[in-house]
Curated annotation (Swiss-Prot):
Its EC number is 2.7.7.87. Disulfide bonds: none annotated. One of its GO terms (molecular function) is ATP binding. It is found in: Cytoplasm. It comes from the Bacteria. HAMAP family: TsaC (MF_01852). Its main location: cytoplasm. Required for the formation of a threonylcarbamoyl group on adenosine at position 37 (t(6)A37) in tRNAs that read codons beginning with adenine. Catalyzes the conversion of L-threonine, HCO(3)(-)/CO(2) and ATP to give threonylcarbamoyl-AMP (TC-AMP) as the acyladenylate intermediate, with the release of diphosphate. The lineage of its organism: Bacteria, Pseudomonadati, Pseudomonadota, Gammaproteobacteria, Enterobacterales. Keywords: ATP-binding, Cytoplasm, Nucleotide-binding, Nucleotidyltransferase, Transferase, tRNA processing. Belongs to the SUA5 family. TsaC subfamily. It comes from Buchnera aphidicola subsp. Baizongia pistaciae (strain Bp). This is Threonylcarbamoyl-AMP synthase. It catalyses: L-threonine + hydrogencarbonate + ATP = L-threonylcarbamoyladenylate + diphosphate + H2O. The gene is tsaC. Gene3D superfamilies: DHBP synthase.
Length: 186
């Protein structure tokens, strides 16, 4: 297994490379959301198409401000966000017009989660911004819940920030903040 320290993982993110890391429920794959080159590597690893979009995780709200159109959020929406984060809930928020299609999946929304997971918070804080977060699995397979499962699917090609997984059994719930629709059960 290719295990890296926090600072080594941050260095890889800054170099627009992909890393693996523990999340609230499964191992995740992540990269710099502003690098199409990093996103292409991530898509190739997962054998996934570009049109699905991605979730961004962050350690605090300021790390995602540049991506979302706050003017489209009412005071009520903001109260929901501020009262429910940090947590395992991912919200689809109105994206600013310049946010790339590879993040939004060609929609007007972007999946955002302010995580309560200590490892994610340390990673995003050290990187200084949000990162892409997607489950560590090849498309169509189950997400990796152990480092052994990760090695079976990806070998040693992707370095890992080791740490404890959260205690959640399922990936995050996804809700559209504007209309309240449930996109994915958590």
């Amino acid at each position: 297994m290719n295990i890296l320290s926090l600072s080594e993982c941050v260095d890889r993110l800054r170099k627009n490379l992909v890393i693996a890391y523990p999340t609230e429920s499964v191992l995740g794959l992540g990269c710099n959301p502003e690098s199409i080159d990093a996103v292409k590597v991530l898509l190739k690893l997962k054998k996934r198409k570009l049109n699905k979009g991605f979730i961004l995780v962050a350690s605090h709200f300021n790390q995602i401000r540049s991506y979302i159109s706050e003017s489209k959020l009412s005071i009520y929406h903001k109260k929901i966000l501020y009262s429910s984060w940090p947590d395992t809930i991912t919200y689809l928020l109105p994206a600013k017009s310049f946010v790339p299609d590879w993040l939004t999946g060609r929609s007007n929304f972007l999946g955002i989660r302010i995580s309560a997971h200590n490892g994610i918070n340390k990673l995003c804080s050290a990187f200084g911004k949000a990162i892409i977060s997607t489950s560590a699995n090849i498309s169509g397979r189950n997400p990796c819940r152990t480092y052994e499962e990760f090695l079976k699917q990806f070998g040693t090609t992707v370095p890992i920030l080791c740490g404890p997984l959260g205690t959640r059994k399922n990936p995050s719930k996804i809700l559209n903040i504007i209309n309240g629709s449930l996109i994915r059960h958590g």
